[in-house]
Amino acid sequence: MSGRTLYYHLVTFLVVVIWGSTFVFTKMLLLSGLSPAQIFTLRFIIAYVLLMGFSLTRSSHRWMAASWRYELLMAGLGVTGGSLYFLAENEALRYTTTTNTSLIVCSCPLFASLLIGAFYRSQRLGRLQMLGMLVAVVGLVLVVLNGHFVLHLSPIGDTLAFGACLCWAVYSLLIIPANQRYDAVFITRKVFFYGLLTIVPYFLWVEPFDVSALAAMTPAVWLNLLYLGVVASMLCFLVWTWVMDKLGAITATNYVFINPVSTIVFAWWLLDEPITPWFLLGTVLILSGMYLSDRRNDSASKSLVE
């Protein structure tokens, strides 16, 4: 592994660690009285405004994609990586446990690999890669359960969590042709824009946005939202788009397995939640599985299957 490739891996790891922390900070916002849809909307508004401001200073700034085909692709990214993904994940928490949701949503690298492999021949998993993926999934189970081997099945909640999982898998597929044509700033700005645009029907028909809740927000809540909007959304989505182009969609998406590891570490640090030996064993299995699944004999070609 070259020094530059190692750098890409370290940056990807950092992004996923930050995303893992967002569950803890989102939980704090939920306890403050904000709804899941409000949290998503506010963090994406912050991210979009800042990224738009930066984009306007660039000589290469453009408002629209070169064709409606690519504009629709951007809309698809905004839905699958923005509004629909976050709504499905957060609504799942209303019907099922955090454990179930984490297990299902964070298994998305497996589904993303299978979906991408159906369109890109060079990305299809070999036996060693599939073994590594399964080892990582076992590690994921151990990390999320953290010594409490009890699952409470909920058809509605688990279906919503699986829907969020599939959304991120589709997002990982759609980002490949987008990266071939546009830079990370343009793509990420479009993701935020269409994510916000497509959340509007939810507020019109399901749950109106409670503007009065904004007036009651404390400085601590605003700082929390700024972290989610500036760091976890604007910076992390921007960097994630970039590293998916550099490492390949499957390699980058495999890092999602680390997401619950980061979540539990932050929960231990900020919420005094325990860490067990099962968590440590699961972490080792996740890292081992990721190493095996990244052992590829061919480069990540970007040619679509005809």
Predicted regions and their residues:
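Hydrophobic/aromatic residues within transmembrane alpha-helices
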Residues: 29, 39, 43, 92, ...
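Helix-helix packing/entry segments at the starts of transmembrane helices
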Residues: 15, 39-42, 82, 86, ...
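Transmembrane alpha-helices of multi-pass small-molecule transport proteins
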Residues: 31-84, 109-115, 167-174, 188-209, ...
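Hydrophobic transmembrane alpha-helices of multi-pass small-molecule transport proteins
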Residues: 51, 55, 109, 115, ...
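Alpha-helical transmembrane segments of compact multi-pass small-molecule transporters, enriched
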Residues: 17, 22, 46-50, 104-119, ...
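Specific transmembrane alpha-helical segments of multi-pass solute transporters/efflux pumps
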Residues: 22-23, 52-105, 142, 229-247
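Glycine-/small-residue-enriched transmembrane alpha-helix faces in small-molecule transporters
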Residues: 1-42, 79, 151-180, 198-201, ...
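Juxtamembrane helix-entry segments on the extracytoplasmic side of multipass membrane proteins
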Residues: 4-9, 33-41, 64-71, 145-170, ...
